Every structure is written in C-alpha cells, then in structure tokens.
C-alpha cells in the first residue's frame, strides 16, 4: 500500500503537477492574450470609427460641392432656355417680316415688269433716278 501511495505521489508530482502548472500558465497566457486582443480590438474599433467619421464628413462636403455645382448648372441652363425662347420669338418675328418684305418686293417687281412691258423708256428713267438717289445717299 505504501508502494502504491508512493507511486501515486510520484506520478502526481512528475506528470500531473507540471500539466496543471502548464494549464494554469496557459490560462494566464490566454487571459493576457485576450486582454491584449481586446485592447487592440478596441483601438481598431476607435480607428475605424474615426476613419468612418472622416469618410462621412468628406462625403458630405463632396455632396455639398456637387449640389452647389448642380444649382449653378441648373441656373445656367434655365437662363439658356430663356435666352433661347427670346431668340426664337424674335427670330419668328424677323422671319415674318422678311417674308412680308419678299412678298412686297415681288409685288413691286411684278408691277415694274408689267409697266416695263408697257412703257420701257419711262421705267428706265425711274430706275436711273432711283440709282442716282441711292448713289447720292450712300456717297454724299
């Protein structure tokens, strides 16, 4: 019995105590590693939060710049549309008067042609007197 007791004590001191010490050491190392990991994780979370906040701030700043450009471009396009409408309006008026002038010129040319067929000498006198008047008005 003493021998069996000695065997158990030797086995306990040779094998079990070192294993228990290793388990305790590994538990302590695990706690320390967990603390370091948690600390490093906290630092990582803090850095991630800072970077995320900076990213959001930059995105808001960029968004405000884009909105400002959008507003300026919208105002420029609105002004361009208004100018285009004004040009279109006056272009229509100008085209109307040009067509009216061409109709009037056609009537006078037709009238002149028919008068020239009737009395060429009188028509040529009219053309000559008009040329003299125009020449005197252009080059006084």
Swiss-Prot record:
Membrane topology qualifier: Multi-pass membrane protein
Record's keyword annotation contains Transmembrane helix: yes
Location, primary (coarse class): host cell
Residues passing through the membrane, by range: 23-43, 93-110
UniProt-annotated location(s): Host membrane
One GO cellular component term noted in the UniProt record for this chain: host cell membrane
Domain of life: Viruses
Keywords attached to this entry: Host membrane, Membrane, Transmembrane, Transmembrane helix
Protein name: Putative transmembrane protein 49
Species of origin: Sulfolobus islandicus filamentous virus (isolate Iceland/Hveragerdi)
